[in-house]
Swiss-Prot record:
GO terms for molecular function: rRNA binding; structural constituent of ribosome. The gene is rplU. It comes from Tropheryma whipplei (strain TW08/27). One of its GO terms (biological process) is translation. This protein binds to 23S rRNA in the presence of protein L20. This is Large ribosomal subunit protein bL21. Belongs to the bacterial ribosomal protein bL21 family. Part of the 50S ribosomal subunit. Contacts protein L20. Keywords: Ribonucleoprotein, Ribosomal protein, RNA-binding, rRNA-binding.
Length: 104
């Protein structure tokens, strides 16, 4: 069984045991988060009805906090000698999907 969930504005394809990284949310260390389900596939049966998906649940356990890849920003103006260099690393939370429930 696998599901498509909405996490941090993106759609992720997950199954039990998969590890996903999303933008920081309000969760304690070792805490759980429930992700909204957009599509559920159980063998040959596909569930896409919004009323049934409201009952479905994907639980994920918080593993660790990381920092994403470095993004370098460089501003430059021609003929003036102006340039500015800056970097940024976005915080990322890593979760492990522990269960997918249909909720019927």
């Amino acid at each position: 069984m696998f599901a498509v969930v909405k996490a941090s504005g993106f759609q992720r394809l997950v199954e039990v045991g998969s590890v996903i990284s999303i933008d920081p949310t309000n969760v304690d260390s070792g805490g759980f988060v429930h992700l909204p389900v957009l599509l559920l596939v159980d063998g040959a049966e596909v569930v896409s009805d919004p009323d049934k998906l409201r009952l479905a649940r994907v639980s994920a356990k918080f593993l660790r906090k990381l920092r994403g890849p470095k993004v370098r920003i460089h501003k430059f103006k021609n003929k003036t000698g102006y340039h500015k260099r800056q970097g940024h690393r976005q915080g990322v939370y890593v979760f492990s999907v522990t269960s997918i429930e249909r909720g019927d």
